[in-house]
Design a protein with these regions (language model features):
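Flanking helices and flexible, charged tails adjoining ferredoxin-like Fe-S electron-transfer domains
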Residues: 1-12, 277-412
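Non-catalytic, usually N-terminal nucleic-acid engagement modules in DNA/RNA processing proteins
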Residues: 1-154, 160-161
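Glutamate identity and glutamate-enriched acidic tracts
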Residues: 15, 21-23, 36, 97, ...
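A composition-driven signal for long, intrinsically disordered, charge-rich low-complexity tracts
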Residues: 51-55, 85-87, 106, 175, ...
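Proline-rich intrinsically disordered, low-complexity coils
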Residues: 74, 80, 84, 88, ...
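Flavin (FAD/FMN)-binding glycine-rich loop and adjacent Rossmann-like elements that form
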Residues: 82-85, 134, 226, 352-361
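Catalytic cores of enzyme domains
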Residues: 105-331
Length: 412
């Protein structure tokens, strides 16, 4: 029996304080904290119609983007007739089944820790008359955490317009299960609020970890047992009586400590090679450099996704070799796991490559354009495709700074 405390990749070692959503990466980029070029990339009109319909801020008309419709919808009223709940455990099972019916691929439930509720909104939304910077009050008891998995093959075509379109489609589709589940619970007579892409009052990642959806990887993302790192996270907070789940142990601590494949493939050196974790806002974890990560996205004009596609946990769901590897990892005692991890990483490099990539053509898009082709508007420089460049080695990491999101803020 493995008696180590979980979650071991997200160890709470001190006091956590709430964070202002305005001091998280996307709002910071939008207001120019990452520089004028990044701000233009965030708001500039794209020449690609897929980019425009998935990003209201870059569209000819924001109402052409479905996500804009969702975020402008007001929160529905709670049915005054309450459906009694006799068994919270049974209700939890029913809610999970309903969430999957609405489109979620993974569901878990945890208590809503106020440390993961943002202090202020970055953007006005929900059509409820709120303004940018309004304080957030969210006193619900539970958080229903859901994940929507991306298609493995199209993710493997990154960085490309093909992978970008699929990634953005996942962001948009993730709103549907959250929106519908919150409405379903309100019709049962209980308050509920949905939180999904571009519409978050909570930080979904730590909640998903506590709800047992997966563990935190070296690359700073959730690793799910079946879907790896390609999960779009959404949350519904509510007072509906529910039974909560426990965090899981997927051997991510041992695997990430040795593997470092995401660090080797990261073109901007934004993922640390260090075996020593850092403590930020009371949590011990591996830290990524958000500045260099975002600026690389601007430089290549794509969502990079190498940290997602290179993750050894990222395989097609249900394949026998992944099921076998996961079973072996989970059943191996903690002290012996490094002996299992090393050959698994070696086999992953052998069969899927040290920098996994799938060539793909779709519509007029090609994930493997000829050398010298650049997607950045106006660029005429000769380039090698990202997946053909040299892998990173341990060495000096990209310059970093203390991001405002890592500095606790006082809650008045």
């Amino acid at each position: 029996m493995n008696a180590a405390p979980v979650p071991r990749t997200f160890r709470i070692v001190g006091e956590m304080q709430r964070v202002d959503e305005r001091e998280t990466p996307h709002p910071m980029m939008a207001r120019g904290d990452f520089g004028e070029r990044a701000q233009r990339w965030r708001h500039g009109r794209s020449g690609d119609a897929f980019v425009r319909i998935f990003n209201a801020g870059r569209a000819t008309d924001p109402w052409n983007a479905m996500a804009h419709l969702f975020v402008q919808a007001p929160e529905g009223k709670v049915n005054p007739v309450v459906t009694p709940v006799g068994d919270p455990a049974k209700m939890s099972q029913q809610i999970k089944e309903i969430a999957r019916f609405f489109g979620a691929d993974a569901v878990g439930i945890t208590h809503l820790d106020q440390a993961y509720v943002y202090t202020h909104r970055a953007h006005a939304w929900r059509g409820d008359g709120t303004k940018d910077g309004n304080p957030i009050t969210l006193n619900h008891k539970y958080a229903i955490c859901m994940g929507l998995a991306g298609d493995n093959d199209r993710y493997m075509a990154a960085p490309s317009h093909i992978a970008d379109a699929h990634y953005s489609m996942g962001n948009t589709l993730s709103m549907i299960p959250a929106f519908m589940l919150a409405g379903y619970i309100r019709e049962m007579g209980y308050p509920a609020r949905w939180h999904a892409y571009n519409s978050m009052d909570v930080n979904p990642l730590p909640l998903a970890i506590m709800a047992g959806l997966g563990e935190l990887g070296r690359h700073g993302m959730l690793i799910h047992e079946e879907y790896g790192s390609r999960m779009h996270l959404m949350v519904v907070t509510t007072d509906l009586p529910l039974a909560v789940d426990e965090p899981v142990d997927l051997a991510v601590e041992e695997f990430c400590r040795y593997c470092k494949k995401c660090a080797r493939t990261c073109p901007s050196r934004s993922i640390t090679f260090s075996d020593v974790k850092d403590v930020y806002n009371g949590v011990e974890k591996w830290r990524i450099n958000v500045d260099s990560c975002y600026m690389n996205r601007v430089a290549v004009n794509h969502n990079c996704l190498y940290c997602t596609t290179s993750c050894c946990y990222n395989k097609k769901p249900g394949v026998w070799y992944h099921t076998l590897a996961m079973g072996l990892l989970k059943k191996t005692p903690l002290r012996l796991r490094p002996l299992v991890v090393r050959p698994l990483v070696w086999m992953d490099d052998l069969f899927w490559g040290k920098r996994p990539h799938v060539g793909m053509k779709w519509l007029d898009y090609d994930s493997d354009p000829p050398d010298g082709t650049c997607d950045v508007p106006g660029c005429v420089a000769l380039h090698r495709p990202q997946h053909k460049k040299r892998l990173q080695r341990p060495g000096p990491e990209a310059p970093s700074r203390l991001y405002p999101s890592d500095r606790p803020v006082s809650v008045s």
